[in-house]
From Swiss-Prot:
Listed Basic and acidic residues bias regions: 197-206, 387-399, 626-649, 671-687, 971-990, 1031-1042, 1077-1089, 1159-1170
GO molecular function: phosphatidylinositol phosphate binding; retromer complex binding
Ranges annotated as biased composition (Polar residues): 370-385, 574-585, 709-728, 735-745, 938-956, 1091-1109
Renumbered ranges of motif LFa 1: 351-372
Job of this protein: Acts at least in part as component of the WASH complex which may regulate wash nucleation-promoting factor (NPF) activity and is required for its membrane targeting during endosomal sorting.
Location of the motif LFa 5: 550-563
Protein name in the entry: WASH complex subunit 2
Encoding gene per record: FAM21
Modified residues (Phosphoserine): 136, 227, 422, 426, 580, 1241, 1245, 1254, 1344, 1380-1381, 1408
Length: 1469
């Protein structure tokens, strides 16, 4: 759009501006805007098209990933054929084309060919047998010899496979087909492989269809013919009829290749089956691309193969992956087809072995150990030549690599590639045999692009014996590409890349001394991931040279070796080639196994994890040197202590068996994870850990979740078992990580290193992934390519490696035992970390969530650091959150098959960063599900019952559990910790409340909290004695967060609870609770005060279980609590009914100052008893709840009537520290005697009430004394200062982890109290109501005491206003029943008849709020004013409390204040 001319014209008119200029300018502007709009639409349309195309590509890529993964994990059904299958059937179309040429032959030629074919068939299928028949009975008679042709038994040469499912079939890698004679087996294996490969090799079939046909015929001949010599002769004639002369040569060559390969495999290589099976397996898994290209290359490589027959035979399988590239290039299409059959033959063998037979792998490994050295030696010579081409290969990667690969791969590369292909198929778990790894790699070849890079890497891995050295340089370049490809493209690719990097390190180990620079360069050029893999290649080469040590590791512990090999990889990269060789020998197999561990075998996966843990330790040794240098900046002592401690600890801390595994295995996984992690890290530094976890998890999705969890839990436990590492990390991390964890989001490298270490050590929910990420990060540190990533990875590596060492070990029990011995506290986080492992389900979200989690985590870390004096908890909590969130997101993928909904839950929960929904609870619920964790919590009253993981620090680590556990660590820190905790739970609740399912999980967390709340009070009992002031401080600090918290619980109530609460609370008057809730919803302030009052009530309810259930809270929540507390409730209800009836009678008799005085001492006693009770509650909540709690609560509830005036005063006194207005209230409060008595209660209550609030609220949630009757004051106070009581309630509740549950109860309790509690005071209200009518001013205070009861019982006040006498009499029974119903309602059952009374009267009470307006003018105005105060404080945060304070002193003021509160109440309603 050219507007320059128009602009020039307009500018020219500027001096003489006219309306025409305006019009021109407007037109120009319109043109510009239209042009912008058009361009914007076009751009947006292009963007939409691009987005669509990206989505399409993503879907296609996901489909490819799914198919590849199904192949890798063996989920795809592969038919094992016992009968021979001719490739001719597959090649029919081409043969038909050729057939038209055949008819040209003359009849003579046809007849001759017919005879030849018949003779050939006859010779092939029949054998001459000479039978001597004596002419006569005479021995001397002439003997006539007759030659008979007897049909050959095709299975004379071809062995029948073992019966499927038999021990031999399971133990033998080739199911009994491979040990047979070479000729027959070659043919047979060819046929099998051809069938499997043809299925997957359409291209090769098409290309060399004629060759395949002839070849197939020959193959059938060879299989049928007893002697292999016949086959070649037969083959040549067959070739002539085939008409393809070029292919006959190829065919002849393929057979020699087959012979060289097959024979070596059968003879030398059969001893080293690991190599040959890998070649077989890759074809089976990815038959066409890998198998055909491999053979194509072998045909071209035959001369090289001849140079080293063993190496060629072993290498030909390895070369197959390169042929994938070759196949893309399709340099030798006819040869490919012919060579395919040979590979195909191998493939079926692998198919039989597949990943299923670890025992086979170990046996084969033993065999290979004996024979691989020779094969490795011969390939080494060829490899040196091939190495440069391989280097080229990585660069060219797909099309170009083809020709170089042919040259390079002629001998060794095949084997290496096959191995590389195999490891993805059978993840490292199969450390025992290398061929298992090769099998795993076989699956990988299907990903042709990935396979290319992987093949290069794999070449180093599998060719390590033959071609490790030369592949080192070349593989390093390919790895970066593959990793980037894998990282970008597929998680599977990431797996492959992780495996491939491992392959590289082995070569490097062979070349480690000559090519140390290669490691450094590769590390720098490519991510450290690649450098570590390069170390592995050295290990492989060493393995080839000294397979004994490698296989010894395999023989001892295949899994261990896998990790050990990884260790070796990591070590050579990082520090000294000298060290790496030692571990390299151990690790070579291990590296592949670790690959398999991640991908294929669930069982293997479980063990590999343990091995990964081990690996991490060895990684620490070599990497420790590099890491120590870098970490020394962060924490020199940490890394050194951890490294030394880990090395020693690995062996010592773990079981005797573990140490061996640790020494060798950890490096393998470290390299794998590093490779994956590095890839991810390159993309997503901080999130790399999460991503890595995802990729591994993705591969392990097929794996059993239990195994994953167990392995992760093991990881968690083991880092702790290596307490030296954890302890060293923790003390340092406690300081650094607490400070740095807060900063960690900003500086992920350094602070993440410390923090992730704790995170990973403490939270191994993503142990494998995080460990891998940390490992990869550490490697990058060595590489220095990504310094940012490296920095965090260093610390993380040290910590994660420690974590990995322990976590990867399969024996979870051992790990737990070790951790238990080392640090019982750590075990709990480990348990929690298990759930976390499950959590990070979402593959992509975890990185973002991880970073986003870092912020909540940081805030939580800050809170935790303040909260938990135990520093270990601090690192764990952020780590748990990040890990749990990532894991929850990844968890969906891991368990996507089984619980996609849950995974979504976890993802959402993880993203929300809810502490209450933290992995520990979710997973505890999943594993333990409902009863195991919940009953334990209430019964023991400690977090430990929830789950061993939840017990110590882990519970504190998790937001929901932290409320429990954080309090336990230290009472002194409790106030600050609770404040932080409150903020965290608020965030969590806000995030979680929107989702019903999150609420559902919150309810579980609430039940856990309810159980844990009681334990929290223990601390308060400790705090209760010294710090009433401290508690007030806590409340002050927490006031704002507390207000927020109540709202979130209200939301939860609203979400699923509203209906349930209404019905449960008020079967008769469901409308009343709804109104109350509407009010709550209408004003968050009121909701908060109600929540605070309710939380106070709930605190007692949680302590006594009666109140909580009485609210008619969600039944499922109550059920969860009922599991533990169910035993308590019945006794509590009855005890409460009886005690409260007595208290009502006493209160009714003692309405005057005596009642108030008695109430105040009772309050003190109740407080003291409650204080005493909390400790018993911790020990046995049932006892306290059954009797002491019941008695205390009635007493407390009784005293409050007297204290009501006092309770307002009391709350001020408690608020005293906050408001300092208590003395004025007390002076004004109850004119003469009442104020002193109220003073007693207040003076006592500040101390005792603080204890009550700390002990009762925390322990028993305040045992109703303060909470129930002080609710109105607390409401007012809480609104003014988010009342001390509320703060205490929230502190105690939060610390007790009742925040959500109690909050949910809070709204309900508010309803119940406003209804039920109003009913209970009715007797006193009825008696006093008559008096208040006559004596408004003096008894306002007395009544305010009783009226506070009236406040709780608004209905009675109404009744009293209308019928004072009757109200007195009926209300008492009603009150008892009502209150008992209150207790009952507090308990889940609303069934009790009194509950019905409640609804009726509470409904009146709701109406009574309106009636209270009249009553305010009437004699019971004081009680109504008090009731107004109760609700009104919610409405008026600041203004109301003074009004309430003033109202108590004078009758006139209460009426006025009553009017205002009523107006507020009406407004709310």
């Amino acid at each position: 759009m050219d507007i320059s001319a128009d602009v020039d014209q307009i500018i020219a008119q500027a001096p003489d501006w006219t309306f025409a200029g305006d019009c021109a300018l407007l037109a120009l502007m319109k043109r510009i805007s239209q042009n912008l709009e058009e361009r914007g639409e076009r751009t947006s349309r292009n963007l939409r098209d691009f987005e669509t195309s990206v989505k399409q590509v993503d879907i296609a890529l996901n489909n490819a990933t799914t198919s590849l993964r199904s192949l890798q994990f063996g989920n795809q059904f592969v038919e094992y054929r016992v009968e021979e299958v001719d490739d001719a059937d597959l090649a029919m179309p081409e043969e038909k084309k050729k057939k038209p040429e055949l008819p040209l032959k003359s009849s003579e030629e046809l007849a001759k060919e017919f005879l030849e074919n018949n003779l050939r068939m006859f010779r092939k299928n029949y054998e001459p047998v000479t039978i001597e028949v004596p002419d006569s009975d005479d021995e001397d008679g002439p003997v006539h010899s007759t030659t008979v042709f007897r049909a050959k038994n095709p299975y004379d040469a071809i062995p029948l496979p073992y019966i499927i499912g038999t021990k031999e079939w399971q133990e033998h890698k080739y199911a009994g087909l491979y040990d047979s004679k070479e000729n027959s087996e070659d043919d047979r294996s060819e046929e099998f492989s051809s069938s499997s490969s043809d299925e997957k090799e359409p291209e090769t079939k098409k290309i060399a269809t004629p060759a395949n046909k002839l070849e197939e015929q020959h193959l059938s001949d060879s299989s049928s013919l007893a002697s292999f010599a016949r086959e070649p002769a037969i083959v040549s004639p067959v070739i002539n009829p085939a008409v393809q002369v070029a292919e006959p040569v190829i065919r002849t060559q393929p057979r020699p290749i087959i012979n060289s390969q097959r024979n070596p495999h059968e003879r030398d290589m059969f001893a080293a089956l690991r190599q040959s099976p890998p070649s077989d397996d890759p074809p089976s898994t990815s038959s066409s691309p890998t198998s055909s290209p491999a053979f194509r290359n072998p045909s071209s490589r035959l001369p090289i193969v001849s140079t080293a027959s063993l190496s060629s035979s072993s290498s030909s399988p390895a070369q197959q992956p390169p042929r994938l590239f070759d196949e893309a290039v399709s340099t030798q299409t006819p040869k490919e087809a012919e060579i395919k059959p040979s590979q195909t033959k191998r493939m079926p063998v692998n198919l039989f072995n597949e990943d299923e037979f670890k025992s086979f792998m170990s046996e084969i490994v033993d065999k290979v150990q004996s024979k691989t050295p020779s094969s490795s030696v011969s390939p080494a010579t060829t490899i040196s030549t091939k190495e440069p081409p391989k280097t080229k290969k990585p660069v060219e990667e797909y099309p170009k690599p083809g020709p170089p690969k042919q040259i390079v791969e002629q001998t060794v590369p095949k084997r290496v590639n096959l191995f590389d292909d195999s490891p993805p198929l059978s993840p490292t778990p199969r450390s025992e045999p290398v061929f298992n790894n090769t099998k795993a790699t076989g699956a990988i070849p299907k990903r042709s692009p990935v396979v290319v890079a992987n093949n290069d890497e794999d070449n180093s891995l599998f060719g390590s014996s033959p071609a490790m050295p030369k592949e080192n340089p070349s593989k390093k370049p390919p790895k970066p590409v593959t990793k980037s490809l894998f990282d970008d493209d597929l998680e599977d690719d990431d797996f492959l890349s992780s495996f491939t990097p491992k392959a590289k390190p082995p070569e490097q180990k062979l070349l480690s001394k000559p090519k140390p620079s290669l490691f450094d360069d590769d590390d720098l050029d490519i991510d450290d991931i690649f450098t570590k893999p390069s170390a592995q290649p050295k290990k492989l080469s060493e393995r080839v040279a000294g397979k004994t040590s490698l296989f010894e590791d395999d023989d001892q512990d295949d899994v261990t070796d896998l990790f050990g090999s990884k260790k070796a990889k990591v070590i050579p990269k990082e520090t000294s080639s000298g060290v790496s060789p030692n571990k390299n020998v151990e690790t070579p197999v291990a590296s592949k196994k670790s690959l398999f561990d991640d991908i294929e075998d669930e069982d293997l996966f479980g063990t590999p994890k343990a091995k990964n843990l081990i690996r991490s330790e060895p990684d620490n040794d070599p990497e420790a040197v590099g890491e120590d240098k870098k970490q020394s900046e962060i924490a020199e002592q940490k890394s050194k202590n951890i490294e030394t401690g880990e090395k020693q600890h690995q062996v010592i801390a773990e079981n005797a068996s573990v140490p061996i595994l640790r020494d060798s295995p950890p490096p393998m996984e470290v390299t794998e994870q590093k490779s994956d992690d590095k890839e991810w890290e390159a993309v997503k530094d901080d999130t790399s850990a999460a991503n890595i976890t995802k990729s591994k998890d993705l591969f392990s999705e097929d794996l059993t979740d239990d195994e994953l969890f167990s392995s992760t839990s093991n990881n968690m436990a083991e880092p702790k078992s290596a307490n030296e590492t954890n302890e060293f990390n923790k003390p340092i991390e406690k300081y650094t990580s607490q400070t740095e964890e807060n900063v960690s989001p900003v500086n992920p490298p350094t602070k993440l290193s410390i923090k992730p270490t704790d995170l990973f050590n403490e939270d191994f929910s993503d142990d494998d992934t995080f460990l891998s990420a940390s490992m990869s990060k550490n490697e990058p540190l060595v590489g220095t390519e990504n310094e940012d990533i490296k920095k965090p990875s260093e610390v993380q590596l040290v910590k994660e490696i420690k974590a990995e060492e322990l976590p990867q070990q399969l024996p979870e029990n051992k790990i737990y035992e070790i951790t238990a011995v080392v640090e019982k506290d750590e075990l709990v986080p480990e348990m929690l970390s298990k759930p976390q492992i499950d959590e990070p389900v979402s593959e992509t979200p975890p990185p973002d969530d991880y970073q986003s989690n870092v912020d909540p985590i940081i805030s939580m870390v800050a809170d935790v650091t303040n909260k938990t004096s135990v520093d270990t908890l601090t690192p764990r909590k952020p780590a748990d959150l990040a890990a749990a969130q990532q894991i929850m997101q990844n968890y969906s993928n891991l368990f996507s098959d089984e619980p996609p909904d849950d995974s979504e839950f976890f993802q959402t929960l993880g993203s929300s960063g809810l502490s209450s929904l933290s992995a520990s609870k979710i997973f505890d619920n999943e594993h333990d599900f409902f009863e195991p964790a919940l009953p334990n919590i209430p019964s023991a009253t400690k977090p430990s019952p929830v789950t061993p993981g939840d017990q110590p620090s882990v519970s504190s680590d998790y937001g929901a559990m932290c409320l429990f556990s954080d309090v336990p660590p230290e009472d002194n820190d409790h106030a600050g910790e609770e404040v932080q905790k409150e903020a965290e739970p608020q965030k969590d609740e806000l995030a979680s409340t929107t989702r019903i399912h999150t609420i559902f999980y919150d309810d579980f967390s609430e039940t856990a909290r309810a159980g844990a709340v009681q334990p929290a009070p223990k601390r308060f009992p400790f705090d209760d004695e010294p710090p009433p002031a401290d508690e007030t401080d806590r409340s002050e600090v927490k006031e704002t967060p507390e207000l927020q918290k109540p709202t979130s619980p209200v939301k939860k109530l609203k979400m699923p609870n509203i209906n349930i609460n209404v019905h449960a609370l008020l079967p008769g008057s469901g409308s009343v609770p709804k109104l109350i809730r509407k009010q709550e919803s209408s004003s968050s302030e009121r909701d908060e005060p109600q929540a605070t009052v309710q939380t106070e009530a709930e605190a007692p309810s949680s302590g006594q279980n009666t109140v909580s259930s009485a609210d008619g809270v969600l039944q499922h929540v109550n059920k969860s609590r009922a599991r533990g507390p169910a035993k308590r409730r019945p006794s509590t209800r009855r005890g409460r009914k009886e005690n409260y009836a007595k208290s009502l009678l006493d209160a009714g008799q003692n309405e005057g100052p005596t009642a108030s005085t008695r109430d105040s001492p009772e309050v003190e006693h109740s407080e003291r008893s409650s204080i005493k009770a909390p400790s018993p509650q911790y020990v046995k909540p049932e006892k306290l709840f059954s009797t002491p709690a019941q008695q205390i609560q009635p007493q407390l509830q009784r005293p409050p009537p007297s204290n009501t005036g006092g309770s307002f005063l009391d709350s001020p006194d408690e608020d005293d520290s906050f408001f300092n207005s208590v003395p004025t209230k007390t002076v004004e409060g109850k004119q003469g005697t009442d104020p002193p008595k109220s003073y007693r209660s207040f003076l006592d209550s500040p101390d005792a009430d603080d204890k009550l609030f700390s002990d009762l609220e925390n322990n028993k949630a305040g045992i109703n004394v303060v909470p129930v009757e002080k609710k109105p004051p607390k409401m007012a106070n809480s609104f003014l200062a988010s009342p001390d009581e509320d703060d205490f309630l929230f502190d105690s509740v939060k610390t007790n982890a009742t925040t959500t549950a109690q909050k949910a109860f809070a709204a309900e309790i508010m309803n119940a109290f406003q209804k039920v509690t109003t009913a209970p005071p009715k007797p006193s209200n009825a008696k006093e109501a008559a008096k208040p009518k006559s004596q408004a001013a003096p008894k306002l205070f007395d009544d305010s005491d009783d009226d506070d009861d009236d406040l709780f019982a608004r209905a009675p006040s109404i009744q009293t206003a209308s019928k004072p006498v009757q109200a007195k009499q009926p209300p008492k029974p009603a009150a008892t029943s009502l209150f008992s119903s209150d207790d009952e309602e507090a308990e889940v059952p609303v069934k009790s008849a009194p509950a019905k009374k409640l609804p009726v009267k509470p409904s009146k009470s709701l109406f009574s709020d309106d009636d209270d307006d009249d009553d305010l003018f009437g004699g019971s105005s004081t009680s109504k004013a008090a009731a107004a105060k109760k609700t009104k404080p919610a409405a008026r945060t600041a203004s109301k409390p003074p009004a309430s304070k003033t109202t108590t002193p004078t009758a006139t003021i209460p009426s006025n204040s009553g009017d205002n509160p009523l107006a507020d109440l009406l407004d709310f309603k």
